């Protein structure tokens, strides 16, 4: 039986992770290690300045107190799930993680930590808040396929599912990340003592939503699968930077 470490960024009681756990337990051994509260937008944050405490629930699920998604996967792999998992799954997120969203997403970060620690990893998001059962069914189907034939890319699979009944899903597309215009809006308020409060505004509008992007696939009713990698090196820019250094003589005599 496949062993799955399951985490998220919406918190341990979120409907997405609970729906997915129920579906996965039909054919897998599942250990939930998730934040005790919503940590959306936590990205790859790792808690280094304080100790982490856990609460083990009556069903065996583990909540990490004030933990980030990355904390949860790190603890799950290195301390809390024994034997260790075969795969790390993050989700189901309430709302999509498309395009530039992946740099902020705690859902994607949890999967990235799993991959960084040497495990296959999936991040699963629903383009809405209704049909979690659809996203769970898609995830189960992919995991069963991975059991039959492992995918040895060494990459994270970022999966975005349209918020539709399963029968209305048109299929699966392998995509690239689209992009958004930068978000510039900040909401300023004052508390009762006159101190300024700032709220981060909504994400920017779509900028690159071409036919091969994750945006386009989900909008057209397809499940989007975008391979992501931990290595952020821009290999094609290395020669450009080398040439620039030579031409500007920055790397000259010190």
UniProtKB/Swiss-Prot annotation:
UniProt key word Signal: no
Reaction equation(s) it catalyzes: a ribonucleoside 5'-phosphate + H2O = a ribonucleoside + phosphate; a ribonucleoside 3'-phosphate + H2O = a ribonucleoside + phosphate; [phosphate](n) + H2O = [phosphate](n-1) + phosphate + H(+)
Q: Which Gene3D superfamilies match?
A: Survival protein SurE-like phosphatase/nucleotidase
Please indicate if the UniProt record lists Nucleotide-binding as a keyword. yes
The enzyme class is hydrolase
Q: Name one GO cellular component term.
A: cytoplasm
Q: How is the cofactor bound?
A: Binds 1 divalent metal cation per subunit.
Which molecular function GO terms apply here? 3'-nucleotidase activity; 5'-nucleotidase activity; exopolyphosphatase activity; metal ion binding; nucleotide binding
Locate the residues binding a divalent metal cation: 9-10, 40, 93
Enzyme Commission number(s) from the entry? 3.1.3.5, 3.1.3.6, 3.6.1.11
Write one Pfam family the protein is assigned to: SurE
- Which key words tag this protein in UniProt? Cytoplasm, Hydrolase, Metal-binding, Nucleotide-binding
Q: Which InterPro entries match?
A: SurE, SurE-like_Pase/nucleotidase, SurE-like_sf
Q: What is its main location?
A: cytoplasm
SUPFAM superfamilies (alphabetical): SurE-like
Its cofactor is:
a divalent metal cation
The compartments listed are: Cytoplasm
Record's HAMAP family? SurE (MF_00060)
The similarity annotation says: Belongs to the SurE nucleotidase family.
What this chain does, per the entry, is described as: Nucleotidase with a broad substrate specificity as it can dephosphorylate various ribo- and deoxyribonucleoside 5'-monophosphates and ribonucleoside 3'-monophosphates with highest affinity to 3'-AMP. Also hydrolyzes polyphosphate (exopolyphosphatase activity) with the preference for short-chain-length substrates (P20-25). Might be involved in the regulation of dNTP and NTP pools, and in the turnover of 3'-mononucleotides produced by numerous intracellular RNases (T1, T2, and F) during the degradation of various RNAs.
What name does this protein carry? 5'/3'-nucleotidase SurE
Species in which this protein is naturally found: Yersinia pestis
């Amino acid at each position: 039986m496949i062993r799955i470490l399951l985490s998220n960024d919406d918190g341990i009681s979120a409907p997405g992770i609970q729906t997915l756990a129920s579906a996965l337990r039909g054919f897998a051994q599942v250990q939930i290690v998730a934040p005790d509260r919503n940590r959306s937008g936590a990205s790859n944050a790792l808690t280094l300045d304080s100790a982490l405490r856990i609460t083990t629930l009556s069903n065996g699920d583990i909540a990490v107190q004030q933990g980030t998604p990355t904390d949860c996967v790190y603890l799950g792999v290195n301390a809390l799930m024994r034997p260790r998992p075969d795969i790390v799954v993050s989700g189901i997120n309430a709302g999509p993680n498309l395009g530039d969203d992946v740099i902020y997403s705690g859902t994607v970060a949890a999967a990235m930590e799993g991959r960084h620690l040497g495990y296959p990893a999936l991040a699963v998001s629903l383009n809405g808040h209704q049909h979690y059962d659809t996203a769970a069914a898609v995830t189960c189907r992919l995991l069963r396929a991975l059991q039959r034939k492992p995918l040895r890319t060494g990459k994270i699979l970022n999966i975005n599912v349209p918020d539709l009944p399963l029968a209305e899903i048109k299929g699966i597309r392998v995509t690239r990340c689209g992009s958004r215009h930068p978000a510039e809006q900040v909401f300023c308020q004052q508390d009762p003592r006159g101190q300024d409060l700032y709220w981060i505004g909504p994400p920017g509008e779509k900028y690159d939503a071409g036919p091969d992007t994750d945006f386009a696939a989900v909008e057209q009713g397809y499940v989007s699968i975008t391979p992501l990698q931990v290595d952020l090196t821009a290999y094609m820019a290395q020669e450009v930077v080398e040439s620039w250094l030579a031409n500007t003589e920055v790397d000259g005599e010190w």
